[in-house]
Amino acid sequence: MASEYLEHKLALLPDQPGCYLMKNANAQIIYVGKAKNLKNRVRSYFKSSHTGKVAAMVEEVADFETIVTSSNKESFLLEITLIQKHQPYYNIKLKRGTGYPYIKITNERDPIIKITGQVKKDGAYYFGPYPNVYAAEETVHFIQKVFPLRRCHGYQGRPCLYYHLGQCLGCCFKEVPEEEYAVQTKRIKSFLNGNTAQVKKQLTARMERAAGQLEFERAAEIRDQLHYIEVTVEKQKIISNDKTPRDLFNFYLDKGWLSIQVFFIRQARLMKREKRLFPVVDTAEEEMTSFILQFYNRRNKLLPKEILLPEGLPNQEIEEILGVPVRTPQRGEKRDLLDMAKENAILSLNEKFRLLEMDRQKTTGAMKEITDELGLPTGHVIEAFDHSHIQGADPVSAMVVFVNGEPAKKLYRKYKLTTVVDHADEAASTREVIFRRYSRLLKEEKPMPDMIMMDGGPIQMEAAKDVLENQLGLNIPVIGMVKNDKHQTADLLYGDDAHHVNLDPRSQGFYLVQRIQDEVHRFAITYHRKVHTKHSLSSRLDEIHGVGPRTRNKLLKAFGSINKIAVAPVEEIRALGINQTTAQLIKVSLQGQAEVKKGSSHD
């Protein structure tokens, strides 16, 4: 249900194409989308029921803004720009720096062949992408041995090592004719485009010649080169009748997850496959279009000669933006490739769901192990507490929540304790935080947890049970989490006699208890450090004559730390409305404190 503010904005939406930016309560952009009709698209989020990631996103939306464009093409381009600029949480995001390895023949007088992750408009010849750097390196090493170009830094007055190895044409000590480079480059391009027959013929002749001249080591080396072609290049299945470099995309949507498959067809072979899985907010077609445009807006911008897409995507707009023919084949081998990509997308997503189900069963099983050992009904929600202080100073408590074995961080709570004690009183701290937490749940009529875990022993357990049973009239199981001498999770305590449960340390249940204990301890310590640091800063300022709470807050808000206040000019301190005398006193006092602290650190 949209707020009154959002309802007012929804009524003002235009019937035009453009982009919309969803924002949360902190004005952060959490989703960017595009639409042919902004009014219809944006209103659909708030006028229909949703599940999964869409529901989570809509629940967070506190505001939105729209940008009207003159055409659908312009909105496509703007959406990609906004996604890459703001990196919204709920969008599919591809890093611009993510690229693939390519083989490059440089556009120089003495060209070299090398591997690169950046494709530039520099007149060079690029081939790829390769599945990984190792595959590209293997191919380059083969080419350097069979079709040498330049492999040194250029003229140096003497032959380089690679010239003696037959892997450099010798520009290191002589002028290599451009025609010789042209012949080699032509052979390399032919080989990279899958024409291996001529290369094999040449290598076979060389091998036989070397063997006839009793150069058996050389013959064995050439034999290995032939073997490379047979097992690395020719073993790949030919899946196309032509050698047009093309990329192929297909997808499958189920249960709010989008599975994408990308096939890179080079030399009529499947050179590389990429698979991606995303939880999605928009329609599969909208998300897929966004993915494709981001895909080609990364560092590697080498486009294929053709892109194949399934039905339902805006082929014309994508073609106009990328400048590459975009087609949806209806029959033949190209259609078969699209169908194969779809089948792989389905298999990939089903595998994801199986893994998710295994994780769910593992965490659910861990919960059952705990409740079985405790003799309790199956539980789903655990709330765990820990306290933190320094010799009783700045006492705090923290609570974490685990639902079905997973942390529910939005439900975590922090408490500054107000109970005044002469020292760290674990029982008093426990009584206060337990009363505050569960009296509030009672007042707000919210559900109670299935069990409460205290990071401590019988003292905390008894204090918690006393408050729950005698003050609030609640019957929630309270369990103690105890640690060994190494401060590691050792066991659980339960019951009126706080007996040891002896949970199997190799079980999933024990592992879950470890996670809960570590998480609540981390959360409490982090919060205490923040409170203690803030209190320490305030105390140092409070010791200065003329500095009251208002002045102290002004200083901390403006400068953020004692050190920054200490080095700030008096004029900047006075600019906060502090008089000259007090400003100078602040400077002198803080610098004096710093000197004392510095001197004591050397004692």
UniProtKB/Swiss-Prot annotation:
Annotated ranges, domain GIY-YIG: 15-92
BP GO annotations: nucleotide-excision repair; SOS response
Localization terms from the record: Cytoplasm
Alphabetical keyword list: Cytoplasm, DNA damage, DNA excision, DNA repair, Excision nuclease, SOS response
Keyword DNA repair: yes
UVR domain mapped to chain residues: 197-232
Stored InterPro entries: GIY-YIG_endonuc (IPR000305), GIY-YIG_endonuc_sf (IPR035901), GIY-YIG_UvrC_Cho (IPR047296), RuvA_2-like (IPR010994), UVR_dom (IPR001943), UVR_dom_sf (IPR036876), UvrABC_protein_C (IPR050066), UvrC (IPR004791)
GO molecular function, one term: excinuclease ABC activity
Gene Ontology CC annotations of this record: cytoplasm; excinuclease repair complex
Primary location recorded for the protein, binned into one broad class: cytoplasm
Listed PANTHER family: UVRABC SYSTEM PROTEIN C, UVRC/OXIDOREDUCTASE
Function of the molecule: The UvrABC repair system catalyzes the recognition and processing of DNA lesions. UvrC both incises the 5' and 3' sides of the lesion. The N-terminal half is responsible for the 3' incision and the C-terminal half is responsible for the 5' incision.
Family, as annotated: Belongs to the UvrC family.
Oligomeric and partner information: Interacts with UvrB in an incision complex.
Protein name: UvrABC system protein C
Organism for this UniProt entry: Limosilactobacillus fermentum (strain NBRC 3956 / LMG 18251) (Lactobacillus fermentum)
